[in-house]
């Protein structure tokens, strides 16, 4: 867009769009419950369990440019007395549980809030864990296919695809996973059966890429 200077010469200026989301901050329980309205994920039911999770954890959230909550994720101790924490302990065992943290699935009202939210939440979880394990849970839905590569970019590795506590199938991710083989096996994210078999045999997804046809492929390594 151009404006006219007083001397008659044109000057080009760049007009930038205002930021759509604000910096990440800690949310109150009320703000998180506001975001949960209409949320269909089984991990956030019943509401009494959500209130228990809010009591023992903290909420990392981001607002839109108008100040309304745009997205949030719960940070929970792995030793918490909640159904999801117990399900993770049953899968992972007790090693590293003391001090460990995990991220619940994000509740998003704006898709562009996901990446800054997950980046800040993962950094916060690592600080709280103080060397303990850091895990993340993502319910296996149509929306999770777009979110999974964002988790992997933050340094989390996909370690399991399984039901948790009789809930819907979930992706379970973990920090601090290293590959033992330099050559990956590329598996389409949509090939759930093959993906689950490789994960169950000890593989981990440490990278992802998209094909020209917008198909997401996961790089699976023995871990």
Locate predicted features.
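A short helix-loop-beta-strand connector motif used in the catalytic cores of GNAT acetyltransferases and
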Residues: 50-61, 65-66, 71, 76-83, ...
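Short amphipathic alpha-helix that is part of the acyltransferase structural core
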Residues: 6-49, 54-64, 68-70, 182-186
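Conserved beta-strand-loop-alpha-helix junction that forms the acyl-donor binding cleft
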Residues: 136-148, 187-190
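Conserved catalytic-core motifs of GNAT/GCN5-like acyltransferases
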Residues: 139-140, 152-171, 204-212
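Conserved acyl-donor/pantetheine-binding loop and adjacent beta-alpha core of acyl/acetyltransferases
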Residues: 68-107
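C-terminal "cap" of GNAT-fold acetyltransferases
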Residues: 164-188, 214-223
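Conserved GNAT acetyl-CoA-binding A-motif
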Residues: 100, 127-142
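Conserved acetyl-CoA-binding loop-helix of GNAT-fold acetyltransferases
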Residues: 108-127, 153
């Amino acid at each position: 867009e151009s404006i006219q200077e007083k001397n008659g010469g044109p000057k080009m200026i760049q007009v930038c769009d205002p930021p759509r989301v604000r910096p990440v901050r800690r949310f109150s329980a009320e703000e998180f419950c506001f975001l949960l309205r209409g949320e269909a994920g089984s991990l956030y039911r019943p509401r009494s369990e959500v209130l228990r999770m809010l009591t023992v954890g903290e909420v990392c959230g981001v607002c839109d440019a108008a100040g309304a909550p745009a997205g949030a994720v719960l940070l929970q101790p792995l030793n918490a007395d909640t159904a999801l924490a117990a399900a993770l302990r049953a899968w992972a065992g007790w090693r590293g549980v003391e001090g460990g943290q995990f991220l619940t699935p994000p509740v998003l009202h704006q898709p562009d809030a996901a990446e800054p939210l997950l980046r800040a939440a993962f950094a916060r979880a690592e600080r709280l864990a103080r060397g303990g394990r850091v895990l993340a849970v993502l319910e296996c839905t149509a929306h999770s296919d777009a979110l999974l590569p964002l988790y992997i970019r933050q340094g989390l590795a996909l370690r399991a695809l399984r039901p948790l506590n009789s809930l819907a199938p979930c992706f379970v991710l973990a920090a601090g996973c290293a590959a033992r083989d330099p050559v990956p096996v590329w598996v389409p994210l949509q090939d759930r059966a093959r993906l689950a078999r490789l994960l169950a045999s000890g593989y981990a997804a440490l990278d992802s890429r998209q094909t020209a046809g917008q198909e997401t492929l996961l790089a699976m390594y023995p871990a």
